[in-house]
Protein backbone atom coordinates (compact mmCIF):
# COMPACT_ATOMS: atom_id res chain seq x y z
CA UNK A 1 0.00 0.00 0.00
CA UNK A 2 2.84 2.40 0.85
CA UNK A 3 4.35 1.87 -2.58
CA UNK A 4 1.10 2.81 -4.30
CA UNK A 5 0.45 5.85 -2.10
CA UNK A 6 3.93 7.26 -2.62
CA UNK A 7 3.70 6.59 -6.36
CA UNK A 8 0.35 8.40 -6.50
CA UNK A 9 1.79 11.38 -4.63
CA UNK A 10 4.74 11.43 -7.03
CA UNK A 11 2.40 11.37 -10.03
CA UNK A 12 0.52 14.38 -8.67
CA UNK A 13 3.78 16.26 -8.11
CA UNK A 14 4.81 15.45 -11.66
CA UNK A 15 1.47 16.67 -12.97
CA UNK A 16 2.32 20.28 -12.14
CA UNK A 17 3.43 21.74 -15.50
CA UNK A 18 5.80 24.59 -14.75
CA UNK A 19 5.81 25.70 -18.39
CA UNK A 20 2.10 26.44 -18.09
CA UNK A 21 2.33 27.91 -14.58
CA UNK A 22 5.33 30.14 -15.34
CA UNK A 23 3.80 31.30 -18.62
CA UNK A 24 0.58 32.34 -16.87
CA UNK A 25 2.44 34.16 -14.10
CA UNK A 26 4.70 35.99 -16.56
CA UNK A 27 1.95 36.87 -19.03
CA UNK A 28 3.18 34.62 -21.84
CA UNK A 29 1.07 32.54 -24.23
CA UNK A 30 0.15 28.97 -23.34
CA UNK A 31 3.14 26.87 -24.50
CA UNK A 32 0.74 24.41 -26.12
CA UNK A 33 -0.19 27.10 -28.68
CA UNK A 34 3.15 27.93 -30.32
CA UNK A 35 6.44 26.47 -31.51
CA UNK A 36 6.54 22.73 -30.99
CA UNK A 37 3.45 22.88 -28.77
CA UNK A 38 5.47 21.19 -26.04
CA UNK A 39 5.08 22.57 -22.49
CA UNK A 40 8.78 22.60 -21.72
CA UNK A 41 11.71 24.96 -21.23
CA UNK A 42 13.00 24.73 -24.80
CA UNK A 43 9.66 25.74 -26.25
CA UNK A 44 9.17 28.52 -23.70
CA UNK A 45 12.59 29.85 -24.75
CA UNK A 46 11.15 30.42 -28.23
CA UNK A 47 9.20 33.36 -26.79
CA UNK A 48 12.53 35.07 -26.25
CA UNK A 49 11.93 35.19 -22.49
CA UNK A 50 15.01 33.51 -21.04
CA UNK A 51 13.89 33.98 -17.43
CA UNK A 52 10.66 32.10 -18.09
CA UNK A 53 12.58 29.29 -19.74
CA UNK A 54 15.00 29.07 -16.81
CA UNK A 55 12.18 29.02 -14.26
CA UNK A 56 10.45 26.30 -16.26
CA UNK A 57 13.62 24.23 -16.47
CA UNK A 58 14.30 24.54 -12.75
CA UNK A 59 10.70 23.79 -11.78
CA UNK A 60 10.38 20.72 -13.97
CA UNK A 61 13.73 19.40 -12.82
CA UNK A 62 13.09 20.16 -9.17
CA UNK A 63 9.79 18.29 -9.06
CA UNK A 64 11.48 15.15 -10.39
CA UNK A 65 14.25 15.44 -7.84
CA UNK A 66 11.92 16.32 -4.96
CA UNK A 67 9.54 13.41 -5.46
CA UNK A 68 12.33 10.83 -5.44
CA UNK A 69 14.29 12.49 -2.65
CA UNK A 70 11.28 12.77 -0.35
CA UNK A 71 10.36 9.14 -1.00
CA UNK A 72 13.88 7.88 -0.37
CA UNK A 73 14.26 10.04 2.75
CA UNK A 74 10.93 9.42 4.45
CA UNK A 75 9.38 6.48 2.60
CA UNK A 76 11.14 3.56 4.33
CA UNK A 77 9.64 4.55 7.69
CA UNK A 78 6.20 4.01 6.16
CA UNK A 79 7.00 0.75 4.41
CA UNK A 80 8.31 1.98 1.06
CA UNK A 81 10.74 -0.54 -0.41
CA UNK A 82 13.14 -0.47 -3.36
CA UNK A 83 10.40 -1.47 -5.78
CA UNK A 84 8.27 1.36 -4.45
CA UNK A 85 11.06 3.88 -4.93
CA UNK A 86 11.38 2.74 -8.53
CA UNK A 87 7.63 3.24 -8.90
CA UNK A 88 7.98 6.77 -7.51
CA UNK A 89 10.72 7.61 -10.02
CA UNK A 90 8.57 6.39 -12.89
CA UNK A 91 5.36 7.95 -11.53
CA UNK A 92 6.67 11.51 -11.27
CA UNK A 93 7.94 11.22 -14.84
CA UNK A 94 4.57 9.91 -16.03
CA UNK A 95 2.91 12.81 -14.23
CA UNK A 96 4.92 15.23 -16.34
CA UNK A 97 4.09 13.37 -19.55
CA UNK A 98 0.39 12.94 -18.73
CA UNK A 99 -0.53 15.61 -16.14
CA UNK A 100 -3.96 15.24 -14.60
CA UNK A 101 -4.04 19.00 -13.90
CA UNK A 102 -3.53 19.92 -17.57
CA UNK A 103 -5.82 17.51 -19.41
CA UNK A 104 -3.00 14.96 -19.73
CA UNK A 105 -1.20 17.19 -22.27
CA UNK A 106 2.31 17.11 -20.88
CA UNK A 107 5.87 17.70 -21.94
CA UNK A 108 8.63 15.45 -23.15
CA UNK A 109 10.16 15.00 -19.72
CA UNK A 110 13.80 15.92 -20.25
CA UNK A 111 14.18 18.22 -17.22
CA UNK A 112 12.03 16.00 -15.00
CA UNK A 113 14.02 12.93 -15.99
CA UNK A 114 17.23 14.80 -15.15
CA UNK A 115 15.86 15.65 -11.71
CA UNK A 116 14.88 12.03 -11.13
CA UNK A 117 18.34 10.79 -12.10
CA UNK A 118 20.06 13.33 -9.84
CA UNK A 119 17.93 12.15 -6.92
CA UNK A 120 18.62 8.48 -7.62
CA UNK A 121 22.36 9.03 -7.80
CA UNK A 122 24.00 12.44 -8.22
CA UNK A 123 26.85 10.96 -10.27
CA UNK A 124 24.33 9.25 -12.55
CA UNK A 125 22.50 12.53 -13.03
CA UNK A 126 25.67 14.50 -13.68
CA UNK A 127 26.97 11.94 -16.17
CA UNK A 128 23.70 12.06 -18.08
CA UNK A 129 23.59 15.86 -17.96
CA UNK A 130 27.18 16.00 -19.19
CA UNK A 131 26.17 13.84 -22.14
CA UNK A 132 23.34 16.25 -22.93
CA UNK A 133 25.61 19.30 -22.68
CA UNK A 134 28.28 17.82 -24.95
CA UNK A 135 25.82 16.91 -27.70
CA UNK A 136 23.92 20.19 -27.37
CA UNK A 137 27.12 22.23 -27.50
CA UNK A 138 28.47 20.62 -30.65
CA UNK A 139 25.24 20.06 -32.58
CA UNK A 140 22.93 22.80 -31.19
CA UNK A 141 19.92 20.49 -31.13
CA UNK A 142 18.18 20.09 -27.77
CA UNK A 143 16.20 17.11 -29.01
CA UNK A 144 19.28 15.25 -30.27
CA UNK A 145 21.04 15.89 -26.97
CA UNK A 146 18.03 14.53 -25.08
CA UNK A 147 17.87 11.42 -27.25
CA UNK A 148 21.54 10.59 -26.82
CA UNK A 149 21.38 11.25 -23.07
CA UNK A 150 18.30 9.01 -22.78
CA UNK A 151 20.12 6.18 -24.53
CA UNK A 152 23.09 6.42 -22.18
CA UNK A 153 21.18 6.92 -18.90
CA UNK A 154 20.20 3.24 -18.40
CA UNK A 155 23.71 2.19 -19.38
CA UNK A 156 25.23 4.54 -16.83
CA UNK A 157 22.84 3.27 -14.16
CA UNK A 158 23.62 -0.41 -14.74
CA UNK A 159 27.36 0.30 -14.72
CA UNK A 160 27.02 2.13 -11.39
CA UNK A 161 24.29 0.21 -9.57
CA UNK A 162 23.70 -3.03 -11.43
CA UNK A 163 20.39 -4.47 -12.59
CA UNK A 164 17.49 -3.95 -10.19
CA UNK A 165 14.00 -2.44 -10.07
CA UNK A 166 15.32 1.09 -10.45
CA UNK A 167 17.26 0.05 -13.53
CA UNK A 168 13.95 -1.02 -15.02
CA UNK A 169 12.39 2.32 -14.12
CA UNK A 170 15.27 4.25 -15.70
CA UNK A 171 15.00 2.12 -18.85
CA UNK A 172 11.24 2.76 -19.13
CA UNK A 173 11.80 6.49 -18.58
CA UNK A 174 14.39 6.48 -21.37
CA UNK A 175 12.09 4.62 -23.76
CA UNK A 176 9.17 6.95 -23.05
CA UNK A 177 11.36 10.02 -23.45
CA UNK A 178 12.59 8.79 -26.82
CA UNK A 179 9.02 8.00 -27.87
CA UNK A 180 7.93 11.54 -26.96
CA UNK A 181 10.59 12.82 -29.34
CA UNK A 182 9.35 10.89 -32.38
CA UNK A 183 8.36 14.08 -34.21
CA UNK A 184 11.74 15.58 -33.42
CA UNK A 185 13.44 12.49 -34.79
CA UNK A 186 11.55 12.92 -38.06
CA UNK A 187 12.52 16.60 -38.22
CA UNK A 188 16.16 15.80 -37.48
CA UNK A 189 16.21 13.33 -40.34
CA UNK A 190 14.73 15.90 -42.73
CA UNK A 191 16.80 18.84 -41.48
CA UNK A 192 13.75 20.74 -40.22
CA UNK A 193 14.44 20.58 -36.49
CA UNK A 194 14.84 23.90 -34.66
CA UNK A 195 18.21 24.64 -33.13
CA UNK A 196 18.79 25.84 -29.58
CA UNK A 197 18.10 29.57 -29.25
CA UNK A 198 16.12 29.79 -32.48
CA UNK A 199 13.03 31.96 -32.07
CA UNK A 200 9.65 31.34 -33.66
CA UNK A 201 6.67 33.64 -33.86
CA UNK A 202 4.33 33.14 -30.92
From Swiss-Prot:
Disulfide bridges in this chain: none
Classification via SMART domains: G3P_acyltransf
Enzyme class: transferase
Residue stretches spanning the membrane: 2-22, 85-105, 119-139, 158-178
Reaction catalysed by this enzyme: an acyl phosphate + sn-glycerol 3-phosphate = a 1-acyl-sn-glycero-3-phosphate + phosphate
Membrane topology: Multi-pass membrane protein
Subunit (UniProt): Probably interacts with PlsX.
Family: Belongs to the PlsY family.
Function: Catalyzes the transfer of an acyl group from acyl-phosphate (acyl-PO(4)) to glycerol-3-phosphate (G3P) to form lysophosphatidic acid (LPA). This enzyme utilizes acyl-phosphate as fatty acyl donor, but not acyl-CoA or acyl-ACP.
Protein name, UniProt field: Glycerol-3-phosphate acyltransferase
Native source species: Cupriavidus pinatubonensis (strain JMP 134 / LMG 1197)
Lineage: Bacteria, Pseudomonadati, Pseudomonadota, Betaproteobacteria, Burkholderiales
